[in-house]
UniProtKB/Swiss-Prot annotation:
Gene3D superfamilies per record: 3.30.300.20
Database matches in NCBIfam families: nusA_arch, PRK08406.1-2
Primary residence: cytoplasm
Subcellular location: Cytoplasm
GO molecular function, one term: RNA binding
SUPFAM superfamilies assigned to the protein according to its UniProt record, in alphabetical order: Prokaryotic type KH domain (KH-domain type II)
Function summary: Participates in transcription termination.
Name under which the protein is recorded: Probable transcription termination protein NusA
A Pfam family that the UniProt record links to this protein: KH_5
The encoding gene: nusA
Classification of source organism: Archaea, Methanobacteriati, Thermoplasmatota, Thermoplasmata, Thermoplasmatales
Annotated Gene Ontology cellular component terms: cytoplasm
Annotated ranges, domain KH: 101-144
């Protein structure tokens, strides 16, 4: 997996330190906006994280004061996208490779669409940013 170069600010560095202290596993990626933070962990690390600390999500939310999402990375694009959107009741993922473009449409539970998109599209942008760090993706949208 090829990763793009990323600049990390002091706040993100602090969030990474908090995650690693509470979750007690190594973090691969941290992507955030004003309302949400997505922590990406290694393959098969979620079970280990919850074995070490069942209250990890609530403790992170208490310390960071943002909506917390944790997803396992995968070398497979479909699996990685499913992992990121899992919490929203993903029921369909369409990946289109045409004209040197990779476009993804994700279907989630109807009541979750607003949360996935976020205010002014901030959450869906965050998810695209996370996926784009590992895969060359042009767009991610939510099936309406």
């Amino acid at each position: 997996m090829e990763m793009n170069e990323i600049t990390v600010d002091n706040e993100t560095m602090a969030h990474i330190a908090i995650f690693e202290k509470i979750a007690r596993i190594e973090l691969m990626e941290c992507v955030e906006n004003e309302d949400m933070i997505l922590f990406v962990v290694g393959e098969h690390k979620m079970a280990e994280m919850f074995r070490k600390n069942k209250e990890v999500i609530s403790q992170l939310k208490e310390k960071i004061n943002k909506h917390i999402l944790v997803a396992e990375v995968s070398r497979d694009l479909l699996t990685f996208v499913r992992n990121i959107f899992f919490r929203y009741g993903v029921n369909e993922i369409q990946i289109s490779w045409k004209n040197n473009r990779t476009d993804i449409v994700v279907g989630v539970k109807p009541e979750e669409i607003g949360k996935v998109i976020g205010k002014e599209g901030k959450n869906i942008k965050l998810f695209k940013d996370a996926v784009s760090r590992y895969f060359n993706v042009n767009s991610i949208s939510v099936k309406q």
